[in-house]
């Protein structure tokens, strides 16, 4: 079942370009989309606008984090493996892992035919905004083998804003 990117049951957070309502564009790290759904099928359709490095989409499904490689241009369809559970209900958070090395347009989502999106609980009134540099965006935060060493050469795979201090503070 196709779900439009602007479905009201999807909660977006972050600084997002919404000039085209049905195709939000994530520019800043930590921009995200979250929803609850039933079933065992989950796909996200995105269009990547690569500036440099390799680009990845972050996903947390039922509290398990993964990353998915994005093509440098054009549409990428990512199928997320959904494990079975007793309730058949799942929580997913897709997020922009990296900084300005790319922008990402959300084209829509898919779940299984006959399945449904489930209303999210109300959003908190609390807000946090952080101004900073690449460290604030989670740059190279997963490069744990290089702690205390000279910066390594990489293609962006060590960047993950989920582990940045602003997102950790917000949680």
Each language-model region and where it sits:
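N-terminal secretory targeting modules
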Residues: 1-132, 136-156
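Extended, H/D-rich, highly charged conserved domains that either
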Residues: 157-171
């Amino acid at each position: 079942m196709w779900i439009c990117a602007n479905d009201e049951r999807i909660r977006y957070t972050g600084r997002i370009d919404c000039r085209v309502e049905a195709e939000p564009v994530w520019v800043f790290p930590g921009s995200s989309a979250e929803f609850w759904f039933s079933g065992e099928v989950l796909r996200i359709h995105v269009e990547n606008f690569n500036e440099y490095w390799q680009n990845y989409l972050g996903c947390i499904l039922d509290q398990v984090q993964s990353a998915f490689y994005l093509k440098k241009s054009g549409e990428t369809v990512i199928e997320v493996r959904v494990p079975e559970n007793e309730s058949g209900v799942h929580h997913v958070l897709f997020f922009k892992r990296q900084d300005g090395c790319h922008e990402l347009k959300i084209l829509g989502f898919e779940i299984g035919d006959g399945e449904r999106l489930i209303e999210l609980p109300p959003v908190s009134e609390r807000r946090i905004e952080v101004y900073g540099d690449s460290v604030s965006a989670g740059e190279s935060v997963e490069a744990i083998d290089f702690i205390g060493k000279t910066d390594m050469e990489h293609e962006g795979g060590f960047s993950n804003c989920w582990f940045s201090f602003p997102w950790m503070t917000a949680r």
